[in-house]
Amino acid sequence: MTVFVIPEKRVAYIADLVTPNRVGFNIMPDFNIGEWERTLGEILELDFDVAVCSHTELSAEEAPGGCTKTHVEEERQFLLDLRGAIFAEFQKGTPADEIPTTVALPQYAEWVGYDEWLPMNAWRVMLDIWMGPYPWVPEG
């Protein structure tokens, strides 16, 4: 995905990389999860005050201000929390095919798509762990 900053406006364009107050869409079909996490970390290093992001579920009070670094951090934390919850289930011995419907992240329960998409997000992250990322990126 293309990310850029308009320095004189202190505005970043981050599109689908951050979707405030919303879990990842469906199975996140075209995302390399590890690279997404890395990219969100790099976005946090950019110099901007507000960002243009897609599929926002910001409240009427928040919407005029657009996305912020707080939203970037929340998106990144969601991915980290999801991965952590999956590993915790593995450690408990939960069968792999039960993990997506067992994982719960109550801190995100108010996010749009939580009930419908969280299990699909979990499947996607698990597949990334088991099979490697898509699209594949060569090392070095």
Each model region followed by its residue ranges:
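Alpha-helix capping and helix-loop boundary segments enriched in small/acidic/polar residues
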Residues: 27, 70-74, 113
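C-terminal regulatory/interaction regions
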Residues: 91-140
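Catalytic core of the metallo-beta-lactamase
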Residues: 1-38, 42-45
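Solvent-exposed loop/turn segments at secondary-structure junctions
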Residues: 11, 17-20, 57-59, 105-107, ...
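Metallo-beta-lactamase
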Residues: 9-16, 50, 130-139
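Divalent-metal (often Zn2+) His-rich catalytic cores of metallo-beta-lactamase-fold enzymes
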Residues: 5, 33-94, 98
